[in-house]
Amino acid sequence: MDAGIYLREIAEQFAKLSLEAVLIGNAAAAIQGAPVTTIDIDFLFRNTPSNIVKLKKLAKAMGLVIFNPLYPASQMFRLMRESDTLQVDFCVRISGIRTYESLRSRATPVSFGDKKLLVASMADIIKSKRAAGRPKDLAVLVTLEEVYAKIQAREKAKAPEPEKAI
């Protein structure tokens, strides 16, 4: 599966619908260079009446079916397309992250075709996986931390030297 094809399609529809969500999980980590895999694409979004309407429009436009597994406990909306097994999960909250706004403030816009998606920072992905504590999340932590260290080193190398007062 080339996730880039799906992410371009999703970014296009988000733009058409003015739907805002932050890409999280292994898909977000892979975009930042982590050698991880996933069978789904996860987003964190605000659970508002208008966003629920937008999710329904997104599902219709992309030929997806909306499921709400474990409702009301999970507050997660799963959108699936049978023809190619695309699975997109929209979470209302995730472990380790206090608010959507805080996650969004640290996210980076990434281009997919001529549209952009917000992608969670590697620090937030690591924090969430550690807080979730599930074996599948803990299994990738060392890999994610190694990639994050490389990201930090690149950012430090790009940062200008602070001016020294004389």
Where are these regions (language model features)?
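Compositionally biased terminal segments of proteins
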Residues: 1-166
